[in-house]
Amino acid sequence: MVKRVSAPNWSRDGKYFLFNRGGRIYKMAVTNGTPELLDTGTAIKCNNDHGISPDGKWLAISDQTVPGGSRVYLVPIAGGAARQITSNAPSYWHGWSPDGKTLAFCGQRTNEFDIYTIPVDGGAETRLTIATGLDDGPDYSPDGEYIYFNSVRSGLMQIWRMKPDGSEQEQVTTDDYNNWFAHPSPDGKWIVFITFAKDVVGHPANQDVTLRVMSLADKKIRVLAKLFGGQGTIYVPSWSPDSRNVAFVSYQLVYP
């Protein structure tokens, strides 16, 4: 059976992608590349939640090799031993602060999944959201002013944003769909996110989904592609460094 590719990251220099296949992280050149397995030490059951540090030297991964659930680890970008960052589980990485000092992740600590941050050197985690229902997918704006995330608190899953300390939480999208995993562009002008139908619970595979972008200047949304995908299509930051392209996974491209 062919293992599905999912959750592509674009490297900081724009030369290669990192992606998940079968719980392992692979590296592939953007042009005519062949996938190469990245050494992640003992972390060999990776989830789709991973991303490259602003300086391009580290990869944050979410791995569940150790019993008890997913935890966040750091691995050298060239491969090597995985250093555990979060002690509590489950924890799913989603964002680096622009200065590279803080990681944002989704964690379940009671009966709720909420947004947390933690220093890259480890230590105490800080809970940022307390609303009832799932809060997920935190990713920093390139200027560090906001963390974008998705929340079901208003009924459907919608895109929200807040200050990095958790203050000033405000809704960004207000339509009749379920919107997940917003990622700001490197130039700070756009967010890209994946949209599911209003009757779809979670972000399952094998769905008709839409990839959309919002202009942060005027909040107008346009469709990039309609595709058959879902799980793993665009979990993690996947903009090209020049903000002109987005990497994503489609099981079968429908439009355009």
Question: What is each residue range found by the language model?
Answer:
Residues 1-256:
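Sequence signature of WD/YWTD-type beta-propeller architectures
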